[in-house]
Amino acid sequence: MIELRHEVQGDLVTVNVVETPEDLEGFRNFIRAHLNCLAVDTETTGLDIYSDTFECRLVQFGTQDEAWVVPVELGDVFIEDVRIAIGALKRMVLQNASFDLQVLDQCFGIEMEGLWPRVLDTQILAKLVDPRPFEAGGFGHSLEELIAKFISEDQAENVKKLMAKLAAEHKTTKAKIWSTIDLFHPEYLLYAGMDTIFTARVCKSLTPLVPDVSRSLVPYEHKISEICSYIDRQGFLLDVEYSRSLAEKWLADQEVWEAIAFTEYGVEKVNSTEDLAEGLEEMGVKITGRTETGKRQVNAALLDKLVEDGNELAAIAQEAKKLGKWRKTWVQKFIDTRDSEDRCHTFINPLQARTSRMSITGIPAQTLPSSDWIVRRCFIAEPGDVMASVDYQAQELRVLAALSGDRNMIEAFENGADLHQMTADAAQVPRKVGKTANFQKVYGGGAKALAEAVGISIPVAKRVHEAFSATYPGVERLSKKLAMEAGRNGYIVNAMGRRLPVDSSRTYSALNYMIQSSSRDVTCRALIRLHEAGYTPYLRLPIHDEIVASLPASEAERAAAHIGHLMQEQMGPVLVGTDPEVGKRSWGSLYGADY
């Protein structure tokens, strides 16, 4: 057995490392002595849990003063002890639990269903205390950031940076060091064991800081994370043949545009700002913008303006860049990261923004072009299934109506009136302007932003905003009330008890934060109802105000209608209704694809 010592907050702590089967007796005694609660963590070969090459190397358990590290990479005898230990623990504390639970499930068959009820996730606690990332004035939510805040900046710097140090020493990258470092390298073992000691200490500091008003959110957010981890695990079936064909087509098209840029305009590389700037200036374009290093600036805004003015080189460059980006970041990535069963796996972060809106990586559903079917066509339903989508009807505007109690807005929804036309008529502008103004109230933005978005003058934009306030006075009252609350307290609190910090210089954002946070909770409450009704195995993506599912073809219409019924919610006087839609085999069929 290896024994490592380290000092934390004036305490000498111990990391014990199992080397042989004989060492397991000491580990078992440690588990027996701490059955009520232990911090748990894993060390793996990387982050791609569902790839064929992914492995779990170490599993570690710890208190605030002692940790045990088990080298599961060495085989079944060690894995079995870990399996027994995890089964015996009444409570487990983890940082970013979804990742480690999926590791234990995928690598050792320890099903998450039996683990989640016993889990306390320090990352969830941290986000309930302060949802802001470090860059936005919060203390952050990574373990390194939490160590810096609640234990010591030196500890965060020294121990959590060990792997970066080892990568540099071994002349490799931080991404590769996890799989290549010797299993018993003392600094690797110290890093692993200390993670659980740090997590246990961070948990002790965080728990009393969760505001009383937010306490009920602790089990609620754990349930949301649990459901999302099951969606992650399930994966979304990829049509590999179509995806490869699309990637090849986009590459060929990109090369054609690049060839035209070279032969017609002498631009060798459209992705080279200098080459492109040279070509544009030879056409008579004056580039006034400069980068921080003094070079000519050719950014998206300039290209958009030039394309609008009919500049062919700008259009060619824009198209080539777009095809390259879409191919690499979307389609080729789907192909490269799919698992052995041709599934791509999401990694859903249910508490990402300061308003708690979800984010998704793996399948970047939230960043795909809103009406495009070509990329979505890559994903298909299970054999014998079809794709279905259920989205909310004007979710955020209905939430705004419910929160504000504005009679005009409520009656508009009750009577099926056109809210966008009402705003437009009040300001004597086209419906498009009224629609943009309505959504700006949801997302925030002043007259200048409205003017730029729809191409009107600032005086007209101000008139539209004034017309909105006059038409929906309840919204204006709510906005002022929330801004005052934010100015007084530095935060507002939504109906679920979630504290939302608001910067003192941006108290006008309080309404936007309240709407986004409340809308997110409408979707999350729906996820819980769907889970309780047994629909989770069929769910593929939660996308803000929409749920995408793979449903048996023979039951799809009925099931989609039932999902829609479960998702809808009565918020006071306003029904936040849903629109179920059933497509064909591919996700893209819901956007116009013929398959």
Curated annotation (Swiss-Prot):
Keywords: DNA replication, DNA-binding, DNA-directed DNA polymerase, Exonuclease, Hydrolase, Nuclease, Nucleotidyltransferase, Transferase, Viral DNA replication. Belongs to the DNA polymerase type-A family. It catalyses: DNA(n) + a 2'-deoxyribonucleoside 5'-triphosphate = DNA(n+1) + diphosphate. Its EC number is 2.7.7.7, 3.1.11.-. It comes from the Viruses. This is DNA polymerase. The keyword Lipid biosynthesis does not apply. The keyword DNA-binding applies. GO terms for molecular function: 3'-5' exonuclease activity; DNA binding; DNA-directed DNA polymerase activity. SUPFAM superfamilies: DNA/RNA polymerases (SSF56672), Ribonuclease H-like (SSF53098). It holds the Pfam family DNA_pol_A_exo1. Gene3D superfamilies: 3.30.70.370, 5' to 3' exonuclease, C-terminal subdomain (1.10.150.20), Ribonuclease H-like superfamily/Ribonuclease H (3.30.420.10), Taq DNA Polymerase, Chain T, domain 4 (1.20.1060.10). Residues 1-212 form the 3'-5' exonuclease domain. SMART domains: 35EXOc, POLAc. PANTHER family: DNA POLYMERASE I, DNA POLYMERASE NU. Residues 213-595 are annotated as: Polymerase. One of its GO terms (biological process) is DNA-templated DNA replication. Replicates viral genomic DNA. This polymerase possesses two enzymatic activities: DNA synthesis (polymerase) and an exonucleolytic activity that degrades single-stranded DNA in the 3'-5' direction.
